Amino acid sequence: MATLTIDEIVEAIKNMSVLEVAELVKRLEEEFGVSAAAMVAAAPAAGAAAGAPAQAEEKTEFDVILKSPGKNKIQVIKVVREITGLGLKEAKELVDNAPKPIKEGVPKEEAEQIKKKLEEAGAEVELK
């Protein structure tokens, strides 16, 4: 088996489409039994411990987390597609693998609108 350098791997990833990168992330998660979403969510929590009072007052960006699609999964998939611009297959995988982040680092107003749309479709949503 040929050994690739990190630079070669980065170049290969730079030439991939967004959908191919999403599939790569999914395969890496399955192969190594990890979740990229958990790492992203855990990073702010570690920083928040150091300056918790200031962080709570200044929080302007939120992550919209789909906790559960509820009973009306098809409607939730449609809303996820509308919000993220994902294709049907990718949106279905995201909904099927809940809890997953739908959007990250969005302003409070936008996060609340997304949460409202998803909850109207029957999903259980959390803002972090």
From Swiss-Prot:
Disulfide bonds: none annotated. InterPro entries: Ribosomal_bL12, Ribosomal_bL12_C, Ribosomal_bL12_C/ClpS-like, Ribosomal_bL12_oligo, Ribosomal_bL12_oligo_N_sf. Gene3D superfamilies: 3.30.1390.10, Single helix bin. Keywords: Ribonucleoprotein, Ribosomal protein. One of its GO terms (molecular function) is structural constituent of ribosome. GO terms for cellular component: cytosolic large ribosomal subunit. It comes from the Bacteria. GO terms for biological process: translation. Coiled coil: none annotated. Forms part of the ribosomal stalk which helps the ribosome interact with GTP-bound translation factors. Is thus essential for accurate translation. NCBIfam families: L12. Belongs to the bacterial ribosomal protein bL12 family. Homodimer. Part of the ribosomal stalk of the 50S ribosomal subunit. Forms a multimeric L10(L12)X complex, where L10 forms an elongated spine to which 2 to 4 L12 dimers bind in a sequential fashion. Binds GTP-bound translation factors. This is Large ribosomal subunit protein bL12. It comes from Aquifex aeolicus (strain VF5).
